[in-house]
Amino acid sequence: MIKRKMDSLKTCFFGGYDKLDTLKYIDTITSEIYMLESAIEKKKNGDNFVIPGETGQRKLKGSALGGFAKPDVDSYICALLGKAAELREKLCS
């Protein structure tokens, strides 16, 4: 599981990442994690499974006013991508 518990993302008055773009990206990675976990479970049970496509890193849109704080978002996304990579490695081994 993700080591750092993230209850919320901090916002900032100026700068940061666009909120909607950030949340969409987090949702995409989280969906990939759920699909990987499901595939691992199917593999354990001997069922057919499909390896989901890899999301990978992408550049988030910036925000002039009221975006999410970059350090928090970067840390959280890094943790999510790490979890996805760990699950993908487990599935492919």
Regions found by a protein language model. Give the residues of each.
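Acidic, negatively charged sequence signal
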Residues: M1-S93
